[in-house]
Amino acid sequence: MKIGASTLAGIEFDLEKSLEFIESLGLDYAELVHQYPAERIDKDLLESYNLKYSIHAPFMDVNIASPQDQSRLNSIKQIESSIDLANEVDAEAVVVHPGTSSFLASKYFKKEVYEFSNRSIKEIGDYANDLGVMATIENMPNFDTMIYQDIHALNELLEEYEMYMTLVIGHANHAGYSADEIIFDSIKHVHAHDNFGDDDAHLPLGEGNIKLNDIINSLESKNYKGIYILEVNDFDSIKKSYEYMKKNF
């Protein structure tokens, strides 16, 4: 079982502090949140740690579903820079958000927003494939601005495009899915965090009401070979979540 942690837990600190902590726990993988304040990441720095990597493409002020051409194209360009980084450091996956829909766009142009997202996802997937990088798309939580909260619709799109999903366990729970509704062959990467279904809280594993054992055992029974990234709020939560994984699996 491959287990790692996201640098999101230490986003307010220097990247080195997060990587040092993740390495100190004995984890094998770190997922680099490739946006401010870590927009520029030194390959030599990464190679100084006994870690392997995945990349989370930027999502702050980035929207690949934007109806505005310049915003959408700039967002795709930023994500392509994360794919370039993944190629340079031999990262196992790049994680991409499918985009958001503003109030006005949701009211008048919801169909078009999904069409723009789909077009962008295909473009990103093609760019990644050309470099031999695996791009994955997240299922999203139950917030008004989020698209692809419907995990089944996302899976259908990714199957059509021959692309892959990052299953975000906490997002699926927040969107109302049970453990037996969210296992697909398209899943090649996992973000693990807990909640009570009322918020996307990113709690340590075991501190919410998600049936984590059922989900992870189902993935393992399908011969899942990807990484389980602990995507929680702080360093202590990484430690608690890693202890949960070691105790239960």
Predicted segments — roles?
Residues 71-164:
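Active-site acidic/histidine proton-transfer and metal-coordination neighborhood
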Residues 1-2, 12-23, 91-92, 147-155, ...:
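Histidine-acidic metal/acid-base catalytic patches
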Residues 29, 54, 136-137, 166-169, ...:
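Generic enzyme active-site microenvironment
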Residues 60-96, 207-221, 229:
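Ligand-binding grooves and catalytic loops that recognize ribose/phosphate and carbohydrate rings
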Residues 6-10, 33-37, 58-60, 99-101, ...:
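Active-site beta-loop-alpha junctions enriched in small/polar residues
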Residues 61-67, 102-107, 197-203:
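A short acidic, helix-capping loop that chelates divalent metal ions and anchors anionic groups
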Residues 47-61, 117-128, 156-160, 212-215:
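Alpha-helix-loop-beta-strand connector modules within alpha/beta enzyme cores
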Residues 1-83, 87, 164, 248:
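N-terminal pre-domain/capping segments
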